[in-house]
Amino acid sequence: MAVLTDEQVDAALHDLNGWQRAGGVLRRSIKFPTFMAGIDAVRRVAERAEEVNHHPDIDIRWRTVTFALVTHAVGGITENDIAMAHDIDAMFGA
């Protein structure tokens, strides 16, 4: 699995909703209507992550959940991260 170039990541960001690249990581924060809705979102993403064996870092702050994607094994953003970002967009709106 190869790390994507800056140009490849920039191109992919055009098709993603609310994702930003910061410090070599893709990040998206989503504010949910309730704390429990955020927890349910984490569960849904966790199920998908298990299916594809690619796990985001997840931060929960009351109703705001932040998903961070990077392929730690290669030290950068890969196609797996882009695919997971698309999966998260499909779950919670693109």
Curated annotation (Swiss-Prot):
EC number(s) on file: 4.2.1.96
Protein name per its UniProtKB record: Putative pterin-4-alpha-carbinolamine dehydratase
Keyword annotations from UniProtKB, A to Z: Acetylation, Lyase
One Pfam family here: Pterin_4a
Stated family: Belongs to the pterin-4-alpha-carbinolamine dehydratase family.
GO biological processes: tetrahydrobiopterin biosynthetic process
Record flagged with keyword Acetylation: yes
GO molecular function per UniProt: 4-alpha-hydroxytetrahydrobiopterin dehydratase activity
Organism (species): Mycobacterium tuberculosis (strain ATCC 25618 / H37Rv)
Bridged cysteine pairs (disulfide): none
Lineage, top ranks: Bacteria, Bacillati, Actinomycetota, Actinomycetes, Mycobacteriales
